[in-house]
């Protein structure tokens, strides 16, 4: 086996991305978190490829994880955090197959994106009832800047500023 490599996703990756994201959604649902259920399908993944830079973590030809980096905030941000500062970049769909979680692959994907943004700001949001993920973002240098209700869940808005490190 070769070491995992990060590369831009392409159209040929759509089916594998849909499978990965839904596998992660079902895994989270088994842990009591349903916020990703019925979110990712072929159309939504294709839309992400058009609107964002989607990166995949591949080992040989298998996609183990993914992350999307874009310049537009999610539709629900304005309702959830109307007074929140605007960021230069937004990170979404950070996902690693359940059998590869807790092995540092999510951190590798996140660090890749942080390296791409340079001195710019990056925001992401996370549901409040996923403490491991909240701690992961905090340990990665993100600061909580707001909280609110979005898509029916209590959510935190996190921001990364390179100068704050």
Can you annotate each of these PLM segments?
Residues 4-19:
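A short beta-loop-alpha structural element at the N-terminal edge
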Residues 22-46:
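Conserved GNAT-fold acetyl-CoA-binding loop/helix
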Residues 52-70:
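Conserved beta-hairpin
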Residues 66-93, 101, 152:
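Conserved acyl-donor/pantetheine-binding loop and adjacent beta-alpha core of acyl/acetyltransferases
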Residues 96, 102-115, 135-139:
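Conserved acetyl-CoA-binding loop-helix of GNAT-fold acetyltransferases
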Residues 101, 123-134, 150-153:
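Conserved beta-strand-loop-alpha-helix junction that forms the acyl-donor binding cleft
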Residues 110, 116-128:
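Conserved GNAT acetyl-CoA-binding A-motif
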Residues 138-147:
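Conserved acetyl-CoA-binding loop of GNAT-fold acetyltransferases
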